[in-house]
Amino acid sequence: MLFGDKGYVKFNYDEQIVKWADCAREKGSEILANPGQLEEWLQCEGTWFVGVDVLPNDSSGGFDEVKLPCIFSKFLDKINLKPYHKAQLSVIYPGYPRPRLGDSKSAFEYRLKRDAAHVDGLLPVGAQKRRYLIEPHGVILGVPLNNTHPGASPIVVWKGSHRIMQQE
């Protein structure tokens, strides 16, 4: 199985990844300087820029200046998910997590106790806001664009969660 028992793959340091991340960070900084983008995507009392599909990558995952790193494209070619959509730029600011507009008390407590987590693709439906797998993701490629301290959680993946999602 491509993701093994863990459900994720950790890639080693690669200079192409650094170049791609540097380019993405520059583009991200331009996006974050745009008041219209902030108005659309800033959530949780100004502590989370959600930024779904805001990075201007092409359908192959690259930018005009730099292609998607080979180590990623070779791996992703095994899954055959092309064309790729625009990348999300998720930025956490000091004070996160704060309640998101419309969050119930239990939803906010979940975020507070679970590494500020949500499960991509699991969306609340109806008045009860029961969660269903509405937007299944073939893969999530998480690339940090800045240095974080050792206790930070730029991306959290629960070991074996891919098996749970397959059952749903």
Locations of regions flagged by a protein language model:
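Fe(II)/2-oxoglutarate
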Residues: 1-13, 19, 23
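Non-heme Fe(II) oxygenase catalytic core, chiefly the N-lobe of the double-stranded beta-helix
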Residues: 3, 21-168
